[in-house]
Regions:
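...captures the hydrophobic TM-helix bundle architecture rather than a specific catalytic motif
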Residues: 1-196
Length: 196
């Protein structure tokens, strides 16, 4: 075919079923959920990148007083890593049509994520008890802002997790929940990467 013909094609006007009943659709197809998650992750990446740039820029000022790092943050990081592993177990179970693998992975991922969020609240309480308020220092404000936004995204992930878990609990087949488990796992891994 000529280059001009290819460039002036309007695939949205072409009948998707061609000669002999063969479907003429693109070779690349993504479910709407995957497209939506990818667009959302791009937006979240931009937000976290801009905050990281602002954080790094603000660190250069003379009045920057860094906060101490409580040991609980390391425990929370471990909880988040193991939660991501549990979500991967659920995803592997979904890909292998193993409902017990999906169930075990989802249960552990949910429990560990709630433990992570509880640990974050505990860290905040520790910081406040030590006098590290958000309004006393820019470093403190950045700490609270970044951990709050990350925590809100984790809580939002728990909403999606709950939808997958409740569908599984009500007896949905692995095939019915496979996509939602895959999307949750991608989201969990992404938030773990942001946290690290």
């Amino acid at each position: 075919m000529s280059l001009f013909h290819e460039m002036t094609k309007k695939p949205w006007l072409v009948d998707p079923v061609g000669a002999e009943g063969v479907q003429e659709v693109g070779a690349f197809f993504l479910p709407h959920g995957k497209v939506g998650l990818r667009v959302f992750l791009v937006v979240v990446t931009v937000i976290f990148t801009l905050m990281t740039i602002a954080y790094a820029d603000r660190m250069l000022f003379a009045n920057w007083l860094p906060m101490p790092e409580p040991w609980v943050l390391w425990l929370n990081t471990a909880l988040l890593i193991v939660s991501g592993i549990a979500m991967q177990v659920a995803r592997n179970g979904a890909q292998q049509d193993n409902i017990s693998g999906v169930r075990d992975g989802l249960v552990w991922a949910g429990v560990l994520t709630v433990a992570f969020l509880t640990g974050q609240l505990y860290v905040w309480q520790q910081m406040v008890d030590l006098g590290y308020y958000a309004n006393t220092n820019t470093a403190n404000a950045f700490f609270y802002l970044l951990t709050a936004i990350h925590g809100l995204h984790m809580a939002g992930g728990l909403v999606a997790w709950w939808r997958s878990f409740s569908r599984m609990w009500r007896g949905a087949s692995v095939t019915d929940i496979r996509l939602s488990v895959e999307l949750c796992t991608t989201y969990w891994h992404y938030l773990l990467l942001i946290w690290l």
